């Protein structure tokens, strides 16, 4: 039996990757299966069940998919049954992973793929729940298991994580090699910290009632249990499919989950029955059980077991008022239960480990689809978001710049064509509308955005000439991304299946209602390039949207096959769609290569300064125009492309300015978690109960999620532009600590510029918004 694989690294939130693996299994017509917990709760705490080829503990995501890269544990023998228990009929035996498999070339991994390092990131201060003041903690390990954020150029259409997908992506290219971390940030600077605590109670309409409070406590208990239990879940054979390769394990799968689902109703999770773990691992099992018990009691309001203390926010030099509803933050004990196994690997199991890494990376996108990462946007009126009392006590209220208070402008003249004018009015909630009428209304709105009266055939939109030059360049749970040429200009086509019954890459297809906000958000930010009062070209351009019908064109399937044979695909081959299947095709401009892949390719630190300047200006314009927060601006969502322009121009509140390009233009993508507002309508993604998103470790990206939650007190409908500052701080950290430049800092000008960026890094958290930074900070003077 092959040796167990190590515990996973921090699972970073991504939509797709270029990792290859075993050929994806096609599951035509597979209906969604209701979630049921597995039967044997002893599997929750088996220390051998948490092993994988990645290098550190991961509690960012929970999964019931045996292909989950966070939990592809060691081969498992037949499960012992308890005395008096009935033996399930027709239960197939589990087969151990073969010791040797044929060698396959390893596809390059992006540092956001959950694989690599064989140990969890070290925390010099001894507290795994927070980041060390030393900025080098955020660096990447040297063995290829980097813990950077998602490098995807496109994100799937619905999710928080990282997120859910959004249709605002562009072109993806091959990933670059991994980078050895080099920390050059000031040693005396303290990173902002937000403890791995329970979330503040999410703001909702039931908050004022006793029933609402009970509901929130129940949700917290469920989230805590889910995160703890499935972090230690034994998935069995990592090569098996979600319900068995041939579907024969479906009955056992659902039966096991149903039994454990009943047991989880009570807090009595302490071990009963025989143990499957070794003596060496039994103490870890008991510790894990006690942690889950404490988490359960904490969610129910039980006293004792957890020491409470106030979590510290970013350090400011100015005064700020205390939050009215500031509560104590309790550090979760789940993160103290993380362990790694130093088992010796035989020569033959190295091949298995390499192959499993590829399979794990490919299944990561399907994992996200199974656990609340693909939610629809919430559309509501400004007056219905959380109370202004919470906003008044936010971390940054006392620092709000005068530029942040300008009302959202009525920006676009209604005399323009529909595609060149705002469509936010289409999202106005109609509470009195019937369900059937609403679906028809949503379809009509979408067809209106497409300038169609109904779906058109694939061939009417994609001519034979366009199809012949199509090349697949990216993918996600949402679907596929192809590059083609339109009017002698390269464009990216994002193809998303909608309104169908079949699962697509493990996720339900979106409806007209769910896809419409994604389209309109991309359109609103793209339209900022045409505005007068607040103008920027820093957001990816959306050229057109079409709704097509039919099966996948053969030439696109050929492009899909070529991508799979050269890079490896995590998606199912899209050949199972019927003739009546609907697709949304979003045509984006060419966006370039993401910052993560360019981390070794930039010419000098001066180029990095231009990148920071362009991103800050784009966010500032979006703040002034749309009260915009990106909320997931990791370096995989920053695209760079070459430009011959010496300067880029933007307009903020009527004032025109320019930025030196240094030969590169920045495009921001992926509005999955974003929040924007216009004409009294707010569109946002409510992640208040997605506890797994806030429990990641090993990268500064995870700390940003927690700091955002602390800033807005877990009310995600509110406007808090300070969240944009937090993401700019994250990007500056990446530039200083994890990027290398072709030209070293050997000239006085470059040395002076590096010191300016270091000063920017040290002082930027004292500013209230991207607008405040752009107008007031010395780096941009």
Swiss-Prot record:
Q: Which SUPFAM superfamilies match?
A: Protein kinase-like (PK-like)
List the keywords (alphabetical): ATP-binding, Cell cycle, Chromatin regulator, Chromosome, Cytoplasm, Cytoskeleton, Kinase, Magnesium, Nucleotide-binding, Nucleus, Phosphoprotein, Serine/threonine-protein kinase, Transferase
Q: Where is this region: Disordered?
A: 1-102, 261-290, 303-330
Reaction(s) catalysed by this chain's protein: L-seryl-[protein] + ATP = O-phospho-L-seryl-[protein] + ADP + H(+); L-threonyl-[protein] + ATP = O-phospho-L-threonyl-[protein] + ADP + H(+)
Enzyme class (EC, first level): transferase
What the entry lists under InterPro entries is as follows: GSG2_C (IPR024604), Kinase-like_dom_sf (IPR011009), Prot_kinase_dom (IPR000719), Protein_kinase_ATP_BS (IPR017441)
Please list the residue ranges that the record marks as compositionally biased, kind Basic and acidic residues. Answer: 276-287
Family designation: Belongs to the protein kinase superfamily. Ser/Thr protein kinase family. Haspin subfamily.
Instruction: Supply the name of the protein.
Output: Serine/threonine-protein kinase haspin
Question: What is the originating organism of this protein?
Answer: Bos taurus (Bovine)
């Amino acid at each position: 039996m092959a040796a167990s694989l190590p515990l996973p690294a921090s699972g970073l939130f991504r939509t797709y990757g270029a990792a290859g693996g075993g050929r994806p299994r096609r599951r035509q017509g597979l209906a969604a299966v209701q979630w049921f917990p597995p039967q044997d709760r002893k599997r929750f705490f088996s220390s051998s069940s948490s092993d994988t080829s990645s290098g550190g503990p991961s509690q960012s995501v929970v999964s019931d998919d045996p292909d989950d890269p966070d939990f592809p544990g060691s081969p498992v023998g037949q499960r012992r049954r308890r005395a008096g228990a009935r033996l399930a009929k027709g239960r197939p035996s589990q087969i151990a992973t073969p010791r040797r498999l044929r060698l396959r070339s390893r596809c390059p991994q992006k540092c956001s793929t959950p694989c690599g390092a064989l140990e969890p990131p070290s925390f010099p201060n001894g507290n795994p729940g927070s980041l060390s003041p030393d900025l080098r903690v955020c660096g990447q390990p040297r063995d290829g298991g980097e813990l950077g954020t998602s490098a995807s150029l496109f994100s799937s259409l619905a999710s928080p994580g990282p997120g859910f997908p959004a249709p605002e992506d562009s072109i993806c290219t091959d990933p670059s090699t991994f980078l050895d971390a080099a920390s050059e940030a000031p040693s005396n600077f303290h990173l902002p910290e937000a403890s791995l605590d329970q979330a503040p109670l999410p703001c909702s309409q039931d908050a004022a009632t006793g029933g609402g409070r009970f509901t929130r406590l129940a949700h917290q208990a469920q989230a805590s249990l889910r995160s703890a239990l499935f972090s230690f879940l034994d998935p069995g054979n990592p090569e098996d499919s979600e319900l068995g390769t041939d579907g024969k394990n479906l009955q056992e799968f659902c039966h096991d989950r149903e039994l454990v689902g009943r047991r989880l109703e009570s807090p009595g999770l302490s071990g009963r029955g025989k143990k499957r773990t070794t003596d060496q691992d039994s103490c870890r099992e008991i510790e894990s059980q006690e942690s889950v018990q404490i988490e359960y009691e904490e969610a129910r309001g039980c006293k004792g077991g957890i020491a409470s203390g106030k979590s510290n926010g970013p350090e400011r030099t100015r005064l700020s008022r205390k939050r009215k509803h500031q509560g104590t933050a309790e550090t979760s004990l789940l993160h103290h239960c993380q362990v790694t196994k130093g088992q010796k690997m035989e020569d033959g199991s190295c091949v298995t480990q390499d192959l499993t890494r590829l399979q794990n990376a490919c299944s990561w996108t399907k994992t996200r689809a199974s656990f609340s990462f693909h939610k629809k946007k919430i559309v509501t009126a400004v007056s219905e978001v959380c109370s202004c009392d919470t906003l008044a006590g936010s971390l940054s209220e006392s620092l709000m710049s005068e530029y942040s208070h300008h009302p959202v402008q009525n920006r676009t003249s209604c005399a323009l064509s529909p595609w060149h004018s705002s469509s936010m009015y289409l999202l106005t909630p109609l509470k009195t509308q019937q369900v059937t009428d609403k679906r028809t209304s949503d379809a009509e709105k979408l067809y209106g955005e497409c300038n169609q009266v109904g779906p058109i055939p694939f061939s009417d939109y994609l001519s034979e000439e366009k199809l012949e030059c199509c090349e697949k360049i990216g993918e996600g749970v949402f679907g596929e991304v192809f590059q083609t040429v339109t009017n002698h200009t390269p464009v990216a086509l994002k193809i998303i299946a909608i309104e169908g019954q079949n699962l697509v890459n493990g996720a339900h297809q979106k409806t007209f209602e769910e896809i419409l906000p994604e389209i309109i958000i991309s359109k609103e930010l793209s339209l900022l390039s045409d505005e007068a009062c607040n103008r920027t070209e820093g957001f990816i351009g959306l050229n057109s949207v079409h709704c097509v019908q039919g099966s996948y064109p053969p030439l696109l399937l050929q492009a899909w096959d070529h991508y799979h044979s050269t890079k490896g695909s995590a998606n199912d081959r899209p050949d199972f769609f019927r003739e009546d299947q609907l697709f949304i095709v979003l045509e984006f401009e060419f966006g370039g290569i993401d910052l993560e892949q360019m981390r070794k390719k930039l010419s000098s630190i001066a180029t990095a300064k231009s990148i920071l300047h362009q991103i800050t200006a784009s966010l500032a314009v979006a703040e002034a125009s749309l009260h915009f927060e990106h909320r997931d601006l990791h370096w995989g969502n920053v695209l760079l492309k070459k430009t011959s322009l010496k300067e880029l121009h933007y307009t903020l509140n009527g004032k025109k300015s320019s930025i030196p390009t240094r030969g590169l233009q920045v495009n921001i993508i992926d509005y999955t978690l974003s929040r924007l507002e216009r004409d009294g309508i707010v569109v946002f993604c409510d992640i208040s109960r997605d506890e797994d998103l806030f429990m990641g470790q090993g990268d500064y990206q995870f700390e940003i999620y927690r700091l955002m939650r602390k800033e807005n007190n877990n009310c995600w409908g509110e406007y808090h532009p300070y969240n944009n500052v937090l993401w700019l701080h994250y990007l500056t950290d990446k530039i200083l600590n994890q990027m290398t430049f072709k030209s070293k800092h050997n000239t006085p000008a470059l040395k002076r510029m590096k010191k300016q960026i270091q000063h920017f890094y040290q002082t930027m958290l004292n500013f209230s918004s991207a607008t405040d930074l752009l107008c007031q900070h010395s780096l941009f003077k």
